[in-house]
Design a protein with these regions (language model features):
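Short acidic (Asp/Glu) and glycine-rich catalytic loops that position anionic groups and cofactors
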Residues: 85-91, 116-123, 262, 343-348, ...
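Conserved PLP-binding catalytic core of the aspartate aminotransferase-like
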Residues: 402-470, 533, 537
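Cofactor-/ligand-binding subdomain signature composed of acidic, glycine-rich
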Residues: 48-88, 109-115, 124-128
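Short, Lys/Arg-enriched N-terminal segments with co-localized hydrophobic residues
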Residues: 16-41
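A glycine-/small-polar-enriched, mobile loop at the entrance of the PLP active site in fold-type I
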Residues: 90-101, 112-139, 269
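PLP-dependent enzyme catalytic core of the Aspartate aminotransferase-like
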Residues: 43-64, 68, 76, 450-540
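Conserved PLP-enzyme active-site core in the AAT-like
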Residues: 140-400
């Protein structure tokens, strides 16, 4: 019995010694990172990237991984969605005229603690203390914008195109209605007005007239469309395009302006494929006594890139110019106002007049984008955007597609898809199924209305950013034609052709999708980023 007990004791001791040895060895492996299993399980994504790239890490990839690592530590689903969006954008040809790809430097400028600072007011005139660095950022962005566009003054606070148009409208109303009224009443401030006097001023604000391009002819919602606040602020008198040519008729616009006598003559577009003669608009504005305002949100990049110069440069001729900072300008999602000195003080009151304050981190990104745009490389890019648009337009026309105004001078075109027996919405849906993003767009005086539409709006800014050229535009046109020819209207429950449903030939879908992916494989979005690594680390 004693022998058995001793043997059991020795076995137990040996087992404990073995366990202790294993524990010590695991500790050594952990300490020296010699265990691949432990390293994979416990290392961070950034450490994994650095160990995988040898002695040549990419600064862009390091920054991106570090950023996503921070995000994933709080909410992995958001990090996964960001990576999935990269995958999505790498998998689709982006032909939406209002979209582009901003640089990784622009993106990085937005991701910092500047977002934490309130900065109501304008530089060196803030309602909050501690804004010295936000002032520096805003003034730098404004200087870059003024240098880029040759503007008297730049106001870089607005968050969107709609916001910036509202600020511009109220700045003009303040300059041309409010200030004369205060002078007439012999007071210096709105706060000095009696209730009755303020009511009279409000009435004068509401009686002003706006003349902008009709929404159905390529104008924007904020240019006096009835469903938008602009038509409720002003008495809206939209002008159109010639029904035969689809072009602006300057003589007809002048005649209308002389009859209407608007406070604001507004030009600019979201779906007009030709350049605008702003010198001619200046002449019309002077003749009818209007303030000339231009919304160049869509083509600001073509102005910055010196494609539109002389009579076609809005900054040279307009009193007030508004623009977004994304689209052709390739900046962050935001906006700004460029104006003559006469309107600078009024524009500066955008906060608190319309805005609650700026987004400092976005203003920082705007400064980066403006700096990027003020280079020979960007001017070359802007020229290529138009060359690609014209190449795509010609290729589509060679395939029998009718284009509004018979071509384009800028970054976009309007294609009539009714010859394929489709509405714009059906064409949009079919293209997306094959990996091409476009948007349905009404043609002037469209019988299908503003929702179903008869057209597609196609733009080349994003494809040009990827590096595509005129040869690729021919392939894109061929893909569009192939998909639309292979699509028929779907049927309603009653068996009648529907305006929204489609019947896409599966063989066409497969063939077109392969062509799209073949094209995208040669022109990769953000090639600095290793998508497979990001998916492995952040998409679970």
């Amino acid at each position: 019995m004693l022998g058995v007990t001793v043997s059991f004791y020795k076995a137990t001791v040996s087992f404990l010694v073995l366990i202790n040895s294993i524990i010590e060895n695991i500790g050594l492996f952990c300490y020296h990172q010699e265990s691949l299993f432990w390293e994979i399980k416990m290392s961070t994504p950034l450490e994994n990237y650095l160990s995988s790239c040898g002695n040549k890490p990419s600064a862009a990839m390091c920054a991106y991984v570090a950023n996503l690592q921070q995000v994933a530590s709080v909410n992995p689903k958001i990090a996964a969605s960001v990576v999935n969006e990269i995958q999505n954008q790498r998998s689709h040809l982006k032909l939406i005229a209002s979209e582009n790809y901003c640089s990784l430097a622009v993106q990085s400028a937005m991701g910092n603690l500047l977002t934490d600072k309130y900065a109501e007011g304008y530089p060196e005139h803030r309602y909050y203390g501690g804004c010295v660095n936000v002032d520096a950022v805003e003034m730098e962005a404004a200087r870059e914008a003024e240098a880029l566009f040759g503007a008297d003054y730049a106001y870089v606070q607005p968050h969107s195109g709609a916001d910036t148009n509202l600020v511009a409208y109220w700045a003009i109303l303040s300059a041309k209605v409010e200030t004369p009224t205060l002078e007439e009443l012999g007071v210096k401030s709105l706060n000095d007005l009696s209730d009755a006097q303020f009511a009279e001023l409000r009435k004068r604000f509401g009686n002003q007239k706006l003349m902008g391009l009709d929404y159905s002819c390529g104008g924007h919602l904020t240019h006096g469309y009835k469903m938008n606040v602009s038509a409720r602020m002003f008495e809206s008198h939209p002008y159109g395009v010639d029904k035969e040519t689809g072009l602006l008729d300057y003589d007809a616009i002048e005649k209308q302006a002389m009859e209407v006598k608007p406070l604001i003559l507004l030009t600019g577009y979201s779906a007009y494929p030709r350049k605008i003669n702003f010198k001619r608009f200046r002449e019309i504005a002077d003749k009818c006594g209007a303030v000339l305002m231009v919304d160049m949100a869509h083509f600001a990049g073509l102005v910055a890139g010196k494609v539109f110069t002389g009579d076609y440069d809005p900054v040279k001729w307009a009193d007030v110019v508004t623009t977004t900072t994304h689209k052709t300008l390739r900046g962050p999602r935001g906006a700004m106002i460029l104006c003559k000195k006469e309107f600078a003080d009024y524009v500066n009151k955008g906060c608190p007049m319309v805005l609650g304050g700026p987004l400092p981190h976005v203003m920082a990104a705007k400064a980066i984008a403006f700096k990027e745009a003020n280079t020979p490389a960007y001017q070359e890019y802007a020229q290529k955007v138009v060359a690609n648009a014209q190449a795509l337009a010609k290729a589509l026309q060679d395939l029998g597609v009718r284009l509004q105004t018979d071509g384009t001078d800028n970054h976009l075109m309007l294609a009539d898809v009714t010859s394929y027996g489709l509405t714009g919405k059906q064409a949009e849906a079919a293209m997306f199924e094959c990996g091409v993003t476009v948007n349905a767009n009404a043609l002037p005086y469209d019988k299908n209305g503003a929702w179903w539409t008869s057209g597609l709006r196609l733009g080349t800014p994003a494809l040009t950013t990827l590096g595509m050229g005129e040869a690729e535009m021919k392939e894109v046109a061929s893909i569009i034609d192939q998909v639309l020819k292979g699509t028929k209207p779907g049927l309603t429950k009653e068996g009648k052709p529907a305006k929204g449903k489609i019947d896409l030939d599966p063989a066409v879908k497969e063939a077109a999708s392969k062509r799209v992916q073949a094209l995208l494989s040669k022109f990769v979005l953000y090639p600095e980023l290793d998508l497979e690594f990001l998916k492995k680390e952040f998409v679970k």
